[in-house]
């Protein structure tokens, strides 16, 4: 049974991920329901599971609507966030394995953006059609990282270190298309960095053609993401504070 992975842009910059195996699908962080329902119905697919990385409205807002259409779909979320994701049916925590679409996913605690943020990893051996994949929500972005709404620079540094330990080929399926802005900011911090400049130019070309820059890869983030390259929590904190107040010209 072959698998495929699809990115579905919604709202201003959200990206939903839809993982398909056979005639079933799982969706990650559905901000809204209708585009997902339309996408699945056009392909005659059944929704088997919803994966929630954290509780923010632009990640869980569509789940109740999906459950109205597919009431038997599982909702996998952090047990520590039950009060904020009350419709979860499978509660998980760091180190857990959870079966989705017949495959075993690993759960990682990557709390920083929020206090109970998790990521889901599909190891390559579990689904060779996809290769290794991480659904990382708003912790790791392509070329950046999430704002620290409920965590500290030390929390984010720890979370990014955990993600950086995944295989280089791991697809980074984050939840927003922020790459161009993230890399423009990074160039201004490191104007002589060839890896960042080359990646930025490639992303600008993609976006001008109307294409997504996602997914990235762990290897690419190691090379050209200043937050993932930060040697300490203090350095990451300085970068994050600067980025929080930065606006593109």
Swiss-Prot record:
It is an enzyme of class 3 (hydrolase). It catalyses: an S-(2-hydroxyacyl)glutathione + H2O = a 2-hydroxy carboxylate + glutathione + H(+). InterPro entries: Clx_II_MBL (IPR035680), Glyoxalase_II_hydrolase (IPR050110), HAGH_C (IPR032282), Hydroxyacylglutathione_Hdrlase (IPR017782), Metallo-B-lactamas (IPR001279), RibonucZ/Hydroxyglut_hydro (IPR036866). This is Hydroxyacylglutathione hydrolase. Zn(2+) 1 binds at residues 54, 56, 113, 138. The gene is gloB. It comes from Parasynechococcus marenigrum (strain WH8102). The keyword Metal-binding applies. Binds 2 Zn(2+) ions per subunit. Gene3D superfamilies: Ribonuclease Z/Hydroxyacylglutathione hydrolase-like. The lineage of its organism: Bacteria, Bacillati, Cyanobacteriota, Cyanophyceae, Synechococcales.
